[in-house]
Every structure is written in C-alpha cells, then in structure tokens.
Amino acid sequence: MLENYGILDGTRWLTNRRGDSLEDTSRYPEGSILKVINHRMVQGVEMCDIKVDYYKYSGVEDGTYFWMGTDYLGRDLWVRMWRGARVSLLIAFISVICNVCIGIVYGSIAGYYGGKVDMIMMRITEIIGAFPEIVVVTLFILFFGTGILSIILCLVVQNWIGTARMIRSQFYRYKGSEYVLAARTLGVRDMALIFRHILPNSIGPIITRAMIAIPGAIFTESFLAYIGLGIRAPESSIGVLLSQGQKVMQQYPNQVFFPAVVISLLMIAFNMLSNGLRDAFDPTQRGA
C-alpha cells in the first residue's frame, strides 16, 4: 500500500509500507508483471510531482520575506532570535542582581568583623565553590526541572562567591580608615558603619564586577540550553536556537550563524561597558 513518506523540496514522495523507494525494482524478477507495474507507477509519479507551497498554507501573504530565514517549523528566525535574547538577558540580569545582593551581605559581614567570623565564613565559601559547576547544575535540573527559575538558581548558587570575596577585600581596605574610626568613636552602630560609611566606597567595583558578570551569565545560560540542561523548546533562548540550528547547520547555516553573531555582540558590548565603567571609577586602571 502506498503512503506519503516525506517531503523534499516541496515534493511528496511515495513509498510502500516497508519504506522502500518505488524506484527500487531489483527485488522483482526480470520481466515480471510487478516490475512492469512498478516502473509505470514511478513514471506517473515523476510526471505528476505535487509541489506544496508551505507559506501559502500558513497564511503568509505574497511578497513577504524573512530577513534571516525561518527555522525548521517555518517560524521567523528574526523574531525568535530577539525573543530568545530577551530571555537570555532576563536570566542574566536577575542572576547577577541576586549574586551582587548575596555577595554584598556575606562579604560585608566577613570583612567587617574579621577574625574567627571571617575564617568560618570563608571556609564555607570554599566548600561551596569546591563542587564542579556542571554537577551542581545537573542536580538542580533533576530536582527543580528545566525552566527560567531553575537556570537562575543554577547561576546564583556559586557565582556570588566572587562578589563576596571582592567586598570582603574592600572592607579590609576601608574599615581602618580615620573616618570609620571617628564614626565608631561617636557611637555609630555596626550596621550603619557597614552600609553608610564603608559600603558606598565600594560601589564602583561592585558595578564594574556586575557588568563583567553579565556576559558570563549569558554564555552559561546559552551553553546549558545548547547541551539540553537549560530552557527547552518551544521556549526560546539563544542557546535553544543554536541547539536547533546545529542539527541542520550544513543545509541551513543561517540558523546557527545569526544566533552566534547576536550572542557574540552581546558579550562584546557588555565587556566594553564594564571596561568603560572600570576606567571611570578607577582611573589608575585606565588602559590596563
């Protein structure tokens, strides 16, 4: 019995139930009636190829063009790419904000009090940071499933450690300053000293580090989606588009090229922004 087997370049090809092409007549004896019938059927199919206009059946008007082509389901790659970039940026910004908040609180306490408090808190960060990131990500995906919240948690669970260490070093630098000693002599409480007198001097390094962390978060999210541990279709992100485009890269290289260009431009832009902020807050680092 004949059935539709697939579509190639808009043409429907007929096969039998076994999946053999109708042009394969080697299984029939020479001169048999089955071979003659098969040959006639192939000639009929070749003369009556059915062309399918997918854009017409999808309701796309004539004269409509897609700047970057379409994906394997006919969806506009331009629209999907920028929606995916929006998701990637959302995940990156939320995760970086959470990292900065946790790092500020943790590093401020460790740096201000010092001594045993600092030693215990730093040993905790070393224990957390000792686990390989891919192991932590896999465990989170197993327990919480895939989705935006899971990816944000994966990016937060370890990445705040660097911010905490940076804040700790800033507190060690400023807590012995004369204005801090004067405020302490006047009876200013510890929390006020931390958040009103010492922390404002660290705003520049904090902002610079946050801007540097955003490209890393974008790349990590895209990498997780690419290997199947992040956001999955039908949701869109840069990593999802790269993963789907990689399957048809030889036939349709545009499905990989344009998402790769977008993620590269995003990372370059944020790196340049972070370098500019670093030079603005710390002129001694200019040109480094």
Q: Over which residues does each language-model region extend?
A:
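Membrane-topology segments of multi-pass transport proteins
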Residues: M1-L73
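Alpha-helical transmembrane segments of integral membrane proteins
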Residues: T70-A288
